[in-house]
Design a protein with these regions (language model features):
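Conserved PRPP/pyrophosphate-binding segment of the phosphoribosyltransferase/PRPP-pathway fold
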Residues: 29-81
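A structural signal for isolated positions on well-ordered beta-strands in alpha/beta enzyme cores
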Residues: 47, 71, 104, 132-134
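Active-site-facing substrate-recognition patch
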Residues: 1-44
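Conserved glycine-rich SAM-binding loop
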Residues: 54, 111, 115
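Short, glycine/charge-rich flexible loops or terminal/linker lids adjacent to PRPP-binding catalytic cores
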Residues: 64-103, 114-121
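PRPP-dependent phosphoribosyltransferase catalytic core
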Residues: 2-17, 120-180
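Glycine-rich phosphate-binding loop signature in dinucleotide/nucleotide-binding domains
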Residues: 38-44, 97-99, 126-127
């Protein structure tokens, strides 16, 4: 596939709402689209910061396509055992390598923008030259990052979340998605 399809409106067969199970192939296309949008906008990041944990996946791919360095910043709502906190929290320091550089923050999806704003605030502390945000997906009607590949109302099941290892060491459907 070529990255010329930089205006994906909807995935083939993707519903307007409900649930969309993303394939690895389609995820790769979203990363290519995102990188092309960044490049065609004239933005040249020196480094990409992926928001851990799921944002490191598109972040690393986009950094590779754009041929720039990659770092991560851990921000999470996860409290373990299927519990989540109301607001995201930072668990690692912003990379000091961002000082004086053009930085692209990447996450897998944006709904409220809380995580992206938290990442921006953390990175501003190390004084980058410029700071932009990008996500593979954005929820319709929500906060819009500087760049995104696809807008959707669907509940998205990412390929890395579809299956997990249970206590018996078996690969099983992620309990979060049972019944969807």
């Amino acid at each position: 596939m070529t990255p010329t399809r930089n205006l994906i409106k909807r995935a083939p067969g993707m519903p307007e709402a409900d649930v969309f199970e993303m394939t690895w192939e389609f995820f790769g296309e979203l990363c290519r689209v995102l990188a092309v949008k960044v490049a065609t906008a004239g933005y040249r990041p020196d480094l990409v910061v992926g928001i851990a944990k799921a944002g490191v996946i598109p972040g690393a791919v986009v950094a590779s396509i754009l041929r720039c360095d990659f770092y991560s910043l851990k921000i999470s709502r996860d409290l373990g055992a299927e519990r989540v906190r109301a607001r995201p929290k930072i668990f690692s320091a912003a990379p000091k390598e961002a000082m004086g550089k053009n930085v692209l923050i990447v996450d897998e999806i944006c709904t409220s923008g809380e995580t992206l704003r938290l990442a921006q605030n953390a990175l501003r502390q190390v004084k980058p030259a410029d700071l932009r945000t990008a996500t593979s997906l954005v929820k319709q009607g929500g906060y819009k990052p500087d760049f995104y590949a696809l807008e959707t109302d669907a509940t998205v099941i990412f390929p890395w979340d579809r299956q997990v290892v249970n206590d018996a060491g078996e690969i099983v459907t992620n309990p979060l998605y049972e019944g969807l």
